[in-house]
Amino acid sequence: MNIVILAAGMGKRMQSALPKVLHPLAGKPLLSHVIDTARQLSPSTLCIIYGHGGEQVPQLLQSKDLSFAKQEPQLGTGHAVMQAVPQLNDDSPTLILYGDVPLTTAASLQRLLDIAGADKLGILTVDLDNPTGYGRIVRENGAITRIVEQKDANEQERSIREVNTGIIVAPTKQLKTWLANLSNKNAQGEYYLTDIVASAVADGVQVVSAQPDHVWETHGVNSKVQLAELERVHQNNIARALLEHGVTLADPARIDVRGTLTCGRDVSIDVGCIFEGDVTLADGVRIDAYCVLHNTTVGAQTHIRPYSHFEGATVGTACIIGPYARLRPGAVLGEDVHIGNFVEVKNSDIAAHSKANHLTYIGDSTIGSRVNIGAGTITCNYDGVNKSRTIIEDDVFVGSATQLIAPIRVGKGSTIGAGTTLTKDAPADKLTVSRSRQITVDGWQRPVKIKK
């Protein structure tokens, strides 16, 4: 099967220099949603028609299974499909999709393909209470005879509620002939793809139709308002699927999934959370309000407190994280690790039962089990040129306001006194401290402010 995706439109109402089909919905371009759906149908040819925005579309979406054809100037949908003709295989049908209609499901498209087979012209249609702006499906004795655009329709035709979604499948050899015979003698001066319906009828090719499971599958995006509306539709669909899977959502209207969210049993998600990329939450995970998780895996029974931000992290079981914690790429936490408020962890492994509860930076470090990191501790991993690692072995106690100048190793069971700046390895099972001796100055008085 051939699939052609029309993605050349300017999108003037978007009020943006970015091509319309590259605007994001749920974290990825509109066009990428359509491509992902098309791939589920296993096409032999997948051709993207681009135009507005120059080379941005092919540059962003390069892939071995995609081909591209440029439409310049843009003279209508029929003219757009003409640009793909050299790439279409005559021996299989051609399905035409739209880069700004992102939510059509593969199931609805497969239904259309099954009805059309290899020798019929198939049209995906919907019935609308208000069909204004859509091409009307004109039938005679139940059979589709043509599609008339809104601007070319008479009063009787405008009363028709069944409309064309634009999604069409056609036998390719005949499609090429019909495209070659298109005329632009209409109110828009464009070559309408819909005119092939009349050509098919004239050639004795049966025209059939199918309808999607949901009307929103055919909604397109022509403005930021429509984009926002479709974003809510999509997020509501995701929220419903999560609820049906057993996830507890404090408010289904206040969750955003911009990628893939996989949840185990008894997962609870509070309001305002955002999930980006691939996120996996194991059984019993609890996420409090306004957390952001990007490409992160969270182990069972872990509790993430409010306003925490994870990116590229792996969190073990029964951990307590936050509030206001930040896990950056390469953060790997073992079982029962506690990361508290205003603690940042980057490119570090922290083993089971260790804690850093307050105001700490842990970067490029390996931390053993049962380690306590005091408030205000900083691993000084960067010398202005190179980054070095800090190694803290099991059962270490690091006092508050400590700086560890990497590369450095803290031996097993050692204690680092509060306020220490550690520049050499600390031996195991001993107290290491480096700070000036405390003194008291008798008779000292504070300076007095000088009057000006």
From Swiss-Prot:
Listed cofactors: Mg(2+)
Gene3D superfamilies linked to this entry: Hexapeptide repeat proteins, Spore Coat Polysaccharide Biosynthesis Protein SpsA, Chain A
Amino-acid positions noted as binding acetyl-CoA in the UniProt annotation, renumbered to this chain: A375, N381, Y382, S400, A418, R435
An annotated GO cellular component: membrane
Protein keywords: Acyltransferase, Cell shape, Cell wall biogenesis/degradation, Cytoplasm, Magnesium, Metal-binding, Multifunctional enzyme, Nucleotidyltransferase, Peptidoglycan synthesis, Repeat, Transferase
Enzyme class: transferase
Coiled-coil residue windows: none
One function term, GO molecular function aspect: UDP-N-acetylglucosamine diphosphorylase activity
Cellular localization per UniProt: Cytoplasm
Residues binding UDP-N-acetyl-alpha-D-glucosamine, per UniProt: 6-9, 20, 71, 76-77, 98-100, 135, 149, 164, 222, 328, 346, 361, 372
Annotated region described as N-acetyltransferase, given as residue ranges: 246-452
Classification via InterPro entries: Bifunctional_GlmU, GlmU-like, GlmU_C_LbH, Hexapep, MobA-like_NTP_Trfase, Nucleotide-diphossugar_trans, Trimer_LpxA-like_sf
Region annotation Pyrophosphorylase: where it falls in the sequence: 1-224
Main location group: cytoplasm
BP GO terms, sorted: cell morphogenesis; cell wall organization; lipid A biosynthetic process; peptidoglycan biosynthetic process; regulation of cell shape; UDP-N-acetylglucosamine biosynthetic process
EC number(s) on file: 2.7.7.23, 2.3.1.157
Cofactor binding summary note: Binds 1 Mg(2+) ion per subunit.
Cited CDD domains: GT2_GlmU_N_bac, LbH_GlmU_C
Family: In the N-terminal section; belongs to the N-acetylglucosamine-1-phosphate uridyltransferase family.
HAMAP family linked: GlmU (MF_01631)
Function: Catalyzes the last two sequential reactions in the de novo biosynthetic pathway for UDP-N-acetylglucosamine (UDP-GlcNAc). The C-terminal domain catalyzes the transfer of acetyl group from acetyl coenzyme A to glucosamine-1-phosphate (GlcN-1-P) to produce N-acetylglucosamine-1-phosphate (GlcNAc-1-P), which is converted into UDP-GlcNAc by the transfer of uridine 5-monophosphate (from uridine 5-triphosphate), a reaction catalyzed by the N-terminal domain.
Name recorded for this polypeptide: Bifunctional protein GlmU
Native source organism of the sequence: Herminiimonas arsenicoxydans
